[in-house]
């Protein structure tokens, strides 16, 4: 009888310890979640205030993006963005968060808005900049602080609008992910009523730093206001950026006389295309 009573007491103590450990673990998890949410709130504030030095503390020295950018390259890009768009404001929303010890994975949806500091010599106004992205951040705890060691951008779209392009509803349709060496189509659409007074181009470039910029070849849109191009992705599995440029003329334009053409609107539209390695693909030479 004494044995069973002792065993019963042992079980009660064991269950109590397990419950305490479970509560302690849950509390620790809750604390880490709060820390990471505050981390991204502080990141959003630093981005919106253009505090580059503060922002650097959020990133590990061995940071690397899925585009192959290191910390130095990343902050050169940030610096250029702040220089050309000093009023930029970011919004970051956490979509999912997972913590495993000293490691965390966070998926965010972010948007940014700004105006260019310089006016266009063509349209005479400052451009409106819009950015939207879905990104997975991989964090590691360094002492008491979290730092970003890697990030993978799943989706990213950017547009820069001058003049009448600010009022035109425009769509750039491209896949977010394709296999290396495969064809994919890109479609650029504007409302049909603008089709006769606009020209557009579509090109694609590999995402590298410093950026490579291929030549724009402008073409007339069809009567529905569409322009389409088919590309083949690179076989090096490097991510690509599709760029559509739009020029909207005023009055009744004569596209055979480009020198006298009066441009009232300009637009640049960028969309990321992530390239997935193809099994057994040969390396491009």
Question: What annotation goes with each model-predicted range?
Answer:
Residues 46-69:
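Short, well-ordered alpha-helical segments enriched in acidic and aromatic residues
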Residues 251-285:
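Short beta-strand elements
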Residues 172-179:
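Short beta-strand segments of immunoglobulin-like
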Residues 183-193:
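Short edge beta-strand/loop segments characteristic of extracellular beta-sandwich folds
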Residues 79-129, 136, 232-241, 247-249:
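Surface-exposed, charged secondary-structure patches
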Residues 123-167, 270-277:
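Short beta-strand edge/turn micro-motifs at domain boundaries
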Residues 21-49, 57, 126, 159-160, ...:
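Short, low-complexity N-terminal intrinsically disordered segments enriched in polar/charged residues
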Residues 114-116, 158, 247-261:
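Short acidic/polar inter-strand loop motif in beta-rich domains
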């Amino acid at each position: 009888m004494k044995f069973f009573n002792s065993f019963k007491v042992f079980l009660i103590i064991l269950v109590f310890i397990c419950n305490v450990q479970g509560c302690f673990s849950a509390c620790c998890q809750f604390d880490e979640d709060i820390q990471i949410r505050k981390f991204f709130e502080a990141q959003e504030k630093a981005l919106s205030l253009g505090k580059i030095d503060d922002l650097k503390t959020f990133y590990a020295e061995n940071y690397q993006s899925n585009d192959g950018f290191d910390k130095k390259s990343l902050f050169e890009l940030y610096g250029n963005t702040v220089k050309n768009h000093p009023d930029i404001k970011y919004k970051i929303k956490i979509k999912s968060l997972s913590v495993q010890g000293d490691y965390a994975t966070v998926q965010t949806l972010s948007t940014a808005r700004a105006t260019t500091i310089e006016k266009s010599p063509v349209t005479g106004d400052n451009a409106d900049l819009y950015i939207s992205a879905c990104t997975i951040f991989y964090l590691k705890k360094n002492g008491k602080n979290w730092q970003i060691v890697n990030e993978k951008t799943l989706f990213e779209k950017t547009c820069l609008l001058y003049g009448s392009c600010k009022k035109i509803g425009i769509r750039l349709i491209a896949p977010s992910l394709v296999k290396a060496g495969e064809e994919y189509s890109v479609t650029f659409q504007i409302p049909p009523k603008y089709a006769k007074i606009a020209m557009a181009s579509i090109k694609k470039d590999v995402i590298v730093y410093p950026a490579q910029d291929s030549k724009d070849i402008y073409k007339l849109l069809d009567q529905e206001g569409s322009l389409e191009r088919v590309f083949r992705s690179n076989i090096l599995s490097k991510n690509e950026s599709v760029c559509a440029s739009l020029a909207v003329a005023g009055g009744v334009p004569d596209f055979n006389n480009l020198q006298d053409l009066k441009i009232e609107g300009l637009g640049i539209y960028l969309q990321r295309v992530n390239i997935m390695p193809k099994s057994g693909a040969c390396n491009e030479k």
